Amino acid sequence: MEALLQGLQRQDRMGALQDSCEAELQELMKQIDIMLDHKRSQWEAETETMKTRLELKEQELNCALDSEERLNQEVRRLRQQLIQQEEETQNKTTQYEAQLSGFKEELNRLKKSYEKVQKKHLRSEMKAKAEEERSEVSRLTRRLEEFRQRSLDWEKQRLLYQQQLSGLEAQRKTLIEQTEMYQQQSHNRKQMLEQTNLVGRSELQNLSGQLHRANDSLCAKEEELETLKIQLRCAVEGQKRAEHETELSKQAVQALKEKAELRATLQAHTEFLQGSRVQKHELLPEGYRGSEVLRENNSIRSLEERLQETGQVGGETEVEAIRSKLSVSRMNEQRLQAEVTCLEDSVESVTSQCQLLAKELKGKEEYLHGVKEDHQKCLSENKKLKGQLSQAELTHKSVLDGMRKEISQLTQELHQRDIRMASSAGIDWERKIKAERQRAEREAAEHRMSLNALENLRQENCRLSELLQTQEPDVAQALVNLEQANQRLQRELLQTQEKLELIAQRRESEIQNAVDSISQELLNKQEQELRIMQERLKVYEQEMQTFRSQQDAASSGSSLESIFSEVWKEQATGSPISAASVDSAIEPVEDLASSLPVPPTSPANAVASRFLQEEEQRSHELLQRLNAHIEELKQESQRTVEHFTQAR
């Protein structure tokens, strides 16, 4: 009975093992099917992407071929255009050369006529200048006479000041006599002085005690200063510590930045490790399954060994059934391995096809690179042809620039002549202003001399008052009065000095402002004239361009005659000639030279006359201002003299 029970228990165990093996085999089959489906979908997607790439590359090749054909057509068309343009440029150059020869002849004629007119104009200008110079000489002589009269007045004032100084010296002598009298009285009052000396000694003792106290307070203050110095040193050390702490904080910030970078790297490493762990977890069940299969095999072998030991027939049949199932499972595994190998072979074939396609793509890319090089060569040829065209245009422009430079030189010569005239007038005015400034400085020096004399008198009065204080203590009230008078005189002297300095500064500032304004106006006028000349040249260039486009000589001739008629009408009426009329009269000269009238004169004389008139007005205003300042100085000096005389 016991043997039967053991056999039944063994059969139950073997049945449980068979059920577990079948379930595991089914799970393995399902997983293998899932893997195969996933790999098939991946391979199909890769093949589709490769096909789409191939189609795109073929389309790009077709587009490149089309663009190459278009470029070839454009190159042919551009070559034809270049040939046509070269022919046209040759024709135009011949025409322009013929026109330039005509223009040069006309310019030579115009230069000769302009030189004649310029000579006449210079003669008339020389006459006008001589008359203006005579008038200026007469005007300057008048001014010199006026300045001489003013200098005589100033000399008279100087004599008055000298007389006042002599009166002050007489007063000083009287004061000396009074001091002698005071000295005689001082001998009589020596006894009073001795008594006062005793009182003074007691006062000196009190003062010495006060001095000791002051010294003690000074020592205390010095100690406080030393404590303050120590505090300053502590503050400096604290500042240094704060700087050191700031440096440490900067280093800490840098360390924090480095920590942040290290944390970022650690996060990247952790993410990588997490990915590897996920892969590991995904692979662990497969390993567990393999280990379970190995355990089952080991258990089967152990059962076989036990059965061999027991020698029971029923156990052998069960073992054979299990072996048959295992053989079936092995066959299935072999079949699956064969399918996997087939799939790997298919993958290798697909990869080889991909490599072939990549090689084909490389070949097509090289072909495209060659096409691009051809295109660049075509572009370089086009650039060369364009450079040739630009050189031809530059040669033509250089010829035109030469003509423009000749015309600009003539205009610059005229402008320089006008500038010289204006600059000479400005230099004369600057010389006059410098002379007036020197005279004003001389007057200020004379006033300073008088002030120095007054200061010397004040010092002598102070010395006398000190002598009186030392000799006669009873005359303290008189000395106090004298000191008050001296202080009042000092204040008045300071006030007069300040007034004189302010007046001198004002005069210098006014003279400097006048010089600056004159120079600034001259510069502005010169800049305006330069701008006008530049605008004229620009207008001339624009009209030259329009003139090139015009080919009808008759119309240009008629316009030229109408322009010159307008100019001569303006001259007849006496109206000022504008810059536009002058430019319009000069511009068509390059086309025709027949029936040319004499060109009008430039407005430089009118500008110079206006400038001289304005400068004369300004000089009159400056002279009036200087006269007013001189009168004010005279009045102030008279007031000071009267004040001093009243005080004395």
From Swiss-Prot:
It comes from Xenopus laevis. Residues 19-188, 222-555, 611-644 form a coiled coil. The keyword Lipid metabolism does not apply. Keywords: Cell cycle, Cell division, Coiled coil, Cytoplasm, Cytoskeleton, DNA damage, Mitosis, Phosphoprotein. Required for normal spindle assembly. Plays a key role in mother-centriole-dependent centriole duplication. Plays a role in DNA damage response. Following DNA damage, such as double-strand breaks (DSBs), is removed from centrosomes; this leads to the inactivation of spindle assembly and delay in mitotic progression. Transmembrane segments: none annotated. One of its GO terms (cellular component) is cytoplasm. Its main location: cytoplasm. The modification Phosphoserine is found at S559. It is found in: Cytoplasm, Cytoskeleton, Microtubule organizing center, Centrosome, Centriole; Cytoplasm, Cytoskeleton, Microtubule organizing center, Centrosome. It holds the Pfam family CEP63. One of its GO terms (biological process) is de novo centriole assembly involved in multi-ciliated epithelial cell differentiation. InterPro entries: Cep63/Deup1_N (IPR031470). Phosphorylation at Ser-559 by atm and atr promotes its delocalization from the centrosome and impairs its ability to promote centrosome dependent spindle assembly. This is Centrosomal protein of 63 kDa-B. It comes from the Eukaryota. Belongs to the CEP63 family.
